[in-house]
Design a protein with these regions (language model features):
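Structural detector for short beta-strands of small beta-barrel domains
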Residues: 1-9
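Short aromatic-glycine-enriched beta-strand elements
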Residues: 11-15
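Beta-strand/loop nucleic-acid-binding surfaces
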Residues: 21-37
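Helix-rich effector regions associated with P-loop NTPase G domains
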Residues: 34-49, 59-76, 81, 97-106, ...
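Short, Lys/Arg- and Gly-enriched loop/turn segments at beta-strand edges
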Residues: 50-58, 86-88
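Phosphate-binding glycine-rich loops and their immediate beta-loop-alpha structural context
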Residues: 83-129
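Canonical P-loop GTPase G-domain recognition
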Residues: 112-163
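A conserved segment at the C-terminal end of the G1
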Residues: 165-181
Length: 291
């Protein structure tokens, strides 16, 4: 029997077979192999007469992320806001680069649009070839479009704490009843209300993963991207790659760099080029043999 792991907690794996949710343990061979089933994994399982199961095989993964530990994500939805707590564009760029590196589609969701539509963020990212949608859990703005983008796909939601992930998911599917947290007036950030990764089935045939806070996407995970690969994680760079004077151009300080020339002409936003440079420096700190 095949199914998808929708939750992993205290050594138990909850597998959705399409007909039922079966509570499973993992076979001992995974421990011996040093591998672990992840939320999102497609697995083969054996079911006992008492209705419990055991995970026998992990089917090939499309992708997987280290932190948060989740596999087979089709779409990464990054929630941002132009109001308290304001999202740093560098964090958006870091997550979008990770998504691209893992062959995962990326969607920027500017939430709390009823308070601030985030015109600058919308301008930067729509011009960069990144899909953007404005949403509000209060007014319902953008929810139909967001729901359409999630249909039939496994999607991970992330964003800095307090940006409204749980509230937005509740607005999309009220039956989820996810715990929400108010934004601290003193700290300017929200309390973490998501403690573990879990996939929630939607009526449109998709799944959403409400993942723990933004700190999960740490520098260690970014360093799995080698410096030479990073340029392919910025879609607006693509028309200019191969047009630099040097074939191994890093687009940082080499002469006759087509990417920097495009930025000078306003075809690439300065903040995106700056983020690329910062991420390149992070990736360059770890040598190839250390990855």
């Amino acid at each position: 029997m095949d199914g998808r792991i929708i939750k992993a907690l205290s050594g138990y794996y909850y597998v959705d077979t399409g007909a039922d949710i079966i509570t499973c343990r993992a076979r001992g061979k995974f421990r011996l192999d040093g591998t672990s089933p992840l939320v999102g994994d497609r697995v083969q399982l054996d079911v006992s007469p008492d209705g419990t199961g055991s995970v026998r095989e992990i089917l090939p993964r499309r992708n997987y992320f280290i932190r948060p530990a989740v596999a087979n994500i089709d779409l990464m939805v990054m929630l941002a806001a132009a109001v308290n707590p304001v999202t740093d564009p560098f964090l958006i760029d870091r997550v979008s680069a990770l998504a691209a590196h893992h062959s995962c589609d990326f969607l920027l969701c500017i939430n709390k649009a009823d308070l601030n539509p985030g015109d600058e963020l919308f301008s930067i990212y729509s011009a960069s070839g990144i899909p953007v949608v404005r949403t509000s859990a209060v007014t319902g703005e953008g929810l139909p479009e967001l729901s359409e983008r999630l249909a039939g796909r496994v999607c991970a939601f992330t964003g800095n704490s307090g940006v409204g992930k749980s509230s937005l998911l509740n607005a999309l599917s009220p039956e989820l009843s996810l715990l929400t947290g108010e934004v601290s007036q003193k700290l300017g950030r929200g309390r973490h209300t998501t403690r573990h990764v879990e996939l929630f089935a939607l009526e449109n045939g998709g799944y959403v993963a409400d993942t723990p806070g933004f700190g999960s996407f740490d520098i260690e995970q970014m360093e799995s991207i080698r410096p030479a690969e990073l340029q392919y994680c910025f879609p607006e760079f693509e028309p200019y790659l191969g047009s630099c004077r040097f074939t191994d151009c890093t687009h940082r300080n080499e002469p006759d760099c087509a990417v920097r020339a495009a930025a000078d002409e306003g075809k690439i936003h300065p903040s995106r080029l700056d983020s690329y440079r910062r991420l390149w420096e992070q990736a360059n700190r770890k040598k190839d043999w250390e990855v």
